[in-house]
């Protein structure tokens, strides 16, 4: 593995962390809206969380393949 490959892999790993972090943040917001009895807003943020998790998992699959 050369320096360019190593840099690219590092950037991909950082993006995986960013995507999972965003997913967790969306869950936190969704839970807050759930606690405030705002189910439509909560549902929106739960969906966003799943979307971010799916982004992370696509990158993980790329790294594993």
Put a short name on every predicted segment.
Residues 1-65:
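Iron-associated oxidoreductase/ferritin-like identity signal
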């Amino acid at each position: 593995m050369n320096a360019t490959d190593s840099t690219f892999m590092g950037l991909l790993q950082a993006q995986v962390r960013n995507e999972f972090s965003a997913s967790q943040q969306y869950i936190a917001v969704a839970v807050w809206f759930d606690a405030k009895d705002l189910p439509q807003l909560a549902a929106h943020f739960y969906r966003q969380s799943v979307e971010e998790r799916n982004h992370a998992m696509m990158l993980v699959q790329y790294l594993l393949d």
